[in-house]
Design a protein with these regions (language model features):
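Nuclease and nuclease-like effector domains acting on nucleic acids or nucleotide cofactors
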Residues: 1-82, 143, 148-155, 187-217
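Short N-terminal edge-element motif at the start of the domain
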Residues: 70-100
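Histidine-centered nuclease catalytic patch
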Residues: 91-126, 130-139
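Polybasic, low-complexity binding patches
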Residues: 117-119, 134-174
Length: 220
């Protein structure tokens, strides 16, 4: 928790400016800007993979770490509460990749209580942990990632205006994408069948998921 700059009327010097430190770090590494560094290390899924979802979220899940694993009715919809396990696995399974050290899976739009966004593949990206904080707190990075997602997939949360291209966007080089899934539904089914106790599998089996009408009995 941050301490106010002035307590008892006394101004105190900031112990560290993290934004300035990151800016210096990326420039010393040879990047022209923080935006260029983040782009170079941010992985999005191939549009050919995401297109197979039709813009829908994969699983009826929302974030509530304290109630993770519990099925509930929220705003008239049956959902499962989760920490970030389900969106993380959704991204990794869709990419056909395993997790790596010191990385973070980020929501492009912070809609953790919206089941239409929380596990939507167009709303997810992966970054090294050392730049992940910028996806939440650095305004230009937030705008950059939102436009990147919209540019790739054409989706955005309901009621949100279409983002506009940031200055210099066309000159950025982005991290390579995993090869596209030939059949995303089949890929995900195979992963769930091999992980029957994983939270996405339980949600799909109990409530349903994007590719089922109600609880998916094929996952029992």
């Amino acid at each position: 928790m941050s301490e106010p700059a002035a307590i008892g009327g006394k101004e105190r010097e900031q112990i560290l400016d993290g934004t300035a430190a990151l800016d210096e770090f990326v420039r010393r590494a040879g990047y022209p800007s923080i935006e260029a560094a983040v782009a170079h290390h941010t992985v999005f899924l191939d549009p050919a993979t995401v297109t197979q979802t039709g813009g829908g979220a994969l699983f009826p899940v929302i974030r509530n770490a304290a109630r993770r694993g519990i099925v509930d009715v929220v705003d008239g919809r049956e959902v499962m509460h989760c920490d970030n396990t389900t969106p993380t696995l959704a991204f990794l399974w869709a990419a056909d990749r395993s997790n790596g050290p010191d990385i973070q899976f980020n929501h492009v739009w912070s809609r953790s209580s919206d089941p239409d966004c929380y596990t939507a593949l167009w709303n997810l990206c992966c970054t090294p942990a050392f730049v992940a904080k910028t996806s939440d707190t650095h305004g230009t990075i937030v705008e950059l990632l939102r436009y990147r997602s919209y540019d790739l997939y054409g989706h955005r949360p309901l009621g949100v205006a279409a983002p506009t291209p940031p200055v210099g966007y066309q000159s950025l080089e982005w991290a390579a994408m995993p090869p596209p899934a030939t059949d995303l539904e089949q890929r995900l089914r195979l992963r769930m069948l091999s992980a029957p106790k994983a939270r996405p599998t339980i949600a799909a089996r109990t409530i349903g998921w994007l590719y089922s009408q109600g609880p998916d009995t094929h996952l029992r």
